[in-house]
Amino acid sequence: MFVRSGILAASILLSVTSCAAPSLEDAQRHVMPLGQTSFAQYAADAKAWIGANRSFVLDTDEGRKMELEANLPKEYRPEHSDGRGILLVHGLGDSPWSFSDIAQSLAANGILVRTVLLPGCGTQPADMMPATADDWRRVVQEQADILSREVDEMWLGGYSTGCNLVLDYADANPGRTKGFVLFSPAVEVRPPFAWAASFVSNFRDWLVTPEIRSSTSWCR
């Protein structure tokens, strides 16, 4: 229950409103189409979607190529597989690039690593508006199901909201997941005045204005 509550809370904080093959409804909502039957097709469709819809930060061809690659779902295939695989899910407003270091390390140890891109991320902030928690659940469900059929032992990993999503999947699909690799899991809000966030948001967007780090904004 706390996992689903965490995902719902993330959706509300971002003002996100609100299964099979890629649908016309997805296109009408301006959400990255899902429903692919392989990781390769999913990654190819994501590349086409990001290329057509991203507001690029860098203004050179090389820079845009670097931006595109940073936001793509990726597969890190080990030279010598030991039969294990892991699906890594990033947090809100982030990208698969956040796992680039750990993914290479895991692959070097014989693990097949795949990352996903949450719908609404990777293009421009406005694209978070039509995306829903169900869209995020769906991409995890689809790609975890695909991975589980291709490896002997499936692990799931996440950062922040990504942790909620993989735990939610495991709760809904008992027995499929061997274990978890979780970074900063967002499963409980402990500050005593967190309940007031929805009220305060009527008067100001931020308690502390966030720092805009242009040096890394290209990778998310």
Locate each region found by the language model.
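Short, surface-exposed "cap/lid" segments of acyl-processing enzymes
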Residues: 69-118
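The alpha/beta-hydrolase serine catalytic core
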Residues: 24, 28-67, 185-220
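Catalytic nucleophile-loop/oxyanion-hole region of alpha/beta-hydrolase
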Residues: 124-150, 155
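Gly/Ala-rich beta-loop-alpha elbow adjacent to hydrolase catalytic centers
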Residues: 158-162, 166
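Short beta-to-alpha linker loops that shape the active-site pocket of alpha/beta-hydrolase fold enzymes
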Residues: 117-122, 186
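Active-site signature of alpha/beta-hydrolase-fold catalytic machinery across serine-
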Residues: 168-172
